[in-house]
Swiss-Prot record:
Domain spans labelled OBG-type G: 160-334
Positions bound to Mg(2+): 173, 193
Organism: Polaromonas naphthalenivorans (strain CJ2)
Main location: cytoplasm
Quaternary context: Monomer.
Protein name stated in the entry: GTPase Obg
Key words of the record: Cytoplasm, GTP-binding, Hydrolase, Magnesium, Metal-binding, Nucleotide-binding
Record-level GO BP terms: ribosome biogenesis
């Protein structure tokens, strides 16, 4: 399922350092020649396509990025140090456009691709550059050139790693709000979610996955009933489905098992491949069940539902069980991502040979 993630950033390459006016001062040499060095180049700003990233969420909290200025020139023909470059890691598929004109400037399409997005300014000239046959003692220098400055809009079509399934009011929006940066509209009535909600779940530094909360499915969704049929087709691109079930519905006449079977039935009717996609069962709203009754309720549900896959017990409202579920999801997503990457071709000229066997010690 694809969504458009976007962020705005301001980047500034480093300015070049100024040149230096200096003359040599040597013993017994009253009028030394010019020896002022040039300024150093300002740092560049690069963007690199990182296959381990899948959203632009980090750039929402870190908008301004500046490279270092170049050092100033010095005497004794010493040039200024060049400014340090900075490299911004972005997901593969990121499109960089000019925030003011809308012109597409760059696209990161290949994993590992690195592009120069802001060039550092050249260093200024020292007075050594101005020496001539008619001017043996120049006192001229030039300042460094300014580095590029740009306001960029970053856009990324995000592929959701995890799709949430469930009847209306199963607690999907509460779950995505509890574990991610998404803030969906939540209320105690069905069909609160009218559009897909996208959330980025942060597990650690540069460790995240994307989860999509879809409008609740109802029986007949595969044939066009309700809201869910509009989004069923997008689930085919996800790597994992979480089937969230309300174990404690407000209406005591509602059977959670029957509802869960209806969801599975819609998947099977719509697409056999979607039905066979990895699907985990998440039993929600444990906080609504007495602690001494939980084990029996869960056991009864799993037995009647006849589910053979992984089962997780959580309360999205109190976040009980959510942390462990998130860690397990991340491990699964990374495993699938790794299996999807093509194997690197090995140049036969550089295959590492096994070490030679040790020679037996000679006996004297």
């Amino acid at each position: 399922m694809k969504f458009v993630d976007e962020a705005y950033i301001d980047i500034a390459a480093g300015d070049g350092g100024s040149g230096c006016v200096s003359f040599s001062h040597e013993k017994y040499k009253e009028f030394g020649g010019p020896n002022g060095g040039d300024g150093g180049r300002g740092g560049h700003v690069y963007a690199v396509a990182d296959i381990n990233l899948n959203t632009l969420v980090d750039f929402r909290f870190s908008r301004r990025h500046e490279a270092r200025n170049g050092g100033h020139g010095m005497g004794s023909d010493m040039f200024g140090a060049k400014g340090d470059d900075i490299i911004l890691k972005m997901p593969v598929g990121t499109i960089l456009t000019d925030a003011e004109t809308g012109e597409v400037l760059f696209e990161l399409l290949v994993p590992g691709e690195q592009i120069l997005i802001a060039k550092g300014g050249d260093g200024g000239f020292g007075n050594l550059r101005f020496k001539s046959s008619t001017n043996r003692a120049p006192r001229s220098k030039t300042p460094g050139w300014p580095g590029d400055r740009k306001s960029l809009k970053l856009e990324l079509k995000v592929l959701a790693d995890v799709g949430l399934l469930g009847m209306p009011n199963a607690g999907k929006s509460t779950f995505i709000s509890a574990v991610s940066n998404a803030r969906p509209r939540i209320a105690d009535y069905p069909f609160t979610t009218l559009h897909p909600n996208l959330g980025v779940v942060r597990v650690g530094p540069e460790q995240s996955f994307v989860v999509a909360d879809l409008p609740g499915l109802i029986e007949g969704a595969s044939e066009g009933a309700g809201l869910g049929h509009l989004f069923l087709r997008h689930l085919q691109r996800t790597r994992l489905l979480l089937h969230i079930v309300d174990l404690a519905p407000f209406d005591e006449g509602v059977d959670p098992v029957a509802q869960a079977k209806a969801i599975v039935g819609e998947l099977k009717k719509y697409d056999e491949a979607l039905y066979k996609k990895p699907r985990w069962l998440v039993l929600n709203k444990l906080d609504m069940i007495d602690a001494d009754e939980r084990a029996a309720v869960v056991k009864d549900f799993v037995k009647r539902f006849k589910f053979k896959g992984p089962v997780f017990e959580i309360s999205a409202l109190t976040r009980e069980g959510c942390e462990q579920l998130v860690k397990t999801i991340y491990q699964h997503v990374k495993k699938v991502q790794k299996s999807e990457q093509p194997e690197e071709e090995v140049d036969p000229r550089f295959i590492e040979l096994p070490p030679e066997p040790a020679k037996p010690a000679s006996s004297d």
